[in-house]
C-alpha cells in the first residue's frame, strides 16, 4: 500500500539509505501516483543524495502547494540549510532556512520543537547568538511544560521510534544552543545509544551539533 511504502521510505532515509528510498518512492509513484508525503520524501531524497539544485526546486514546489505545513517547512528549511552547508557563500539560503523554521514555529504557537531548535541554530549561524539562545530557551521550557503535563496524566510524549528520536535530540540541541553543554552531551549520547540503527539521522544530528559547538 502507499502508506506502508511511505513508512519504509522514511525508515530507509533515517537509516542512511536515501538512494534505496528513492527507488522505492519511484515505484510507489508508478503504482499509486504522488501525494503530499511522497513529494516531501522525494525532496528529502534529492537533498540526501547530493542533488541539491533539484532539491531546492522541489522545495519551492512544496512550499507553493503546502505553505502552512510544519513538515514541509522543516524539510524545505533543511534543504536550504544544506545548500549553505555545502557553500558558505549561500547566505541567502541560510536566511531562507531560518525564515521558514521560525515563521512556522511561531505560527504553530511555538509547540514544534524540531522547528524551534532549527530556528535557534540558524539564528546562531546568522550571527544572532542572543536571539538563538532566546529561541532555544523557549523550546526547552515548552518541552518541560509538555512533559510535566503528560507525566501528571501518566502519559509519554512519544511512543518510540523516529518521532521519539527527533524529540530527544531536539531537546539536546536546545540545551546546546542555550550553553548547557554538559546536559546536551548527556542527552545526545543517550539518544544515539538508544537508536543506533538511525545512522542517517544520527549523522545529520552530529554534524549540526558540531557546527553549533564551533559557532558558540
State what each model feature region is.
Residues 27-28, 62, 104, 191:
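Canonical positions in the second alpha-helix
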